[in-house]
Design a protein with these regions (language model features):
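Alpha4 helix (beta4-alpha4-beta5 surface) of REC/receiver domains from two-component response regulators
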Residues: 73, 94-115, 119-122
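Non-catalytic signal-transmission and effector/linker regions of two-component phosphorelay proteins
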Residues: 1-12, 118-131
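Receiver (REC) domain active-site loop signature in two-component systems and cognate sites
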Residues: 66
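Active-site beta3 strand of CheY-like receiver
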Residues: 55-61
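Acidic catalytic/metal-coordinating carboxylates
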Residues: 44-47, 69-73
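Conserved acidic segment of CheY-like receiver
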Residues: 9-30
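Short amphipathic alpha-helix used as the core "switch/output" element in two-component signaling
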Residues: 50, 72-84
Length: 131
């Protein structure tokens, strides 16, 4: 699903998470920041890749455990196809091997969902330097 960004937006963000309630909350959090706007949301890894190709976001926030294509595989494809993208992985899973795998796949950051409020906005603001 795509969303129209405001004209004042500096960082265009795509969010991918299969938990609709979490996705909605995250969208509200990001859209409340004047320098950020959610331009699309995806419920699985394949949809995230398709939307990234269509919408050309500055940043993607992606869950690691999703249907159709997991976040690690989606991150690898996103990094390959969009090398300048700010790619932030979100997960509730604190397994070091999973975090290592998604970093190796191309994620710039891995955040636990429990760290969301403190860490995500800081990292998305850093995307400004990349765009």
């Amino acid at each position: 699903m795509s969303h129209a960004p405001s004209e004042e937006t500096h960082i265009r963000v795509l969010i991918a998470d299969d938990d609709r309630a979490f996705l909605s909350s995250l969208q509200v959090l990001i859209d409340r920041q004047p320098e950020l706007a959610v331009i699309g949301t995806a419920l699985d890894g394949l949809e995230a890749i398709e939307l990234a190709d269509d919408l050309d976001p500055d940043a993607v926030v992606i869950d690691l455990h999703m249907p159709l294509l997991d976040g690690v595989s989606a991150a690898a494809r996103l990094r390959r196809d969009h090398p300048n993208l700010c790619l932030i992985a979100l997960t509730g899973d604190d397994a070091p091997a999973l975090h290592r795998a998604v970093r190796e796949a191309g994620a710039d950051e891995v955040l636990l969902k429990s760290e969301l409020v403190e860490g995500l906005l800081v990292r998305l603001a850093a995307a400004r330097a990349r765009s």
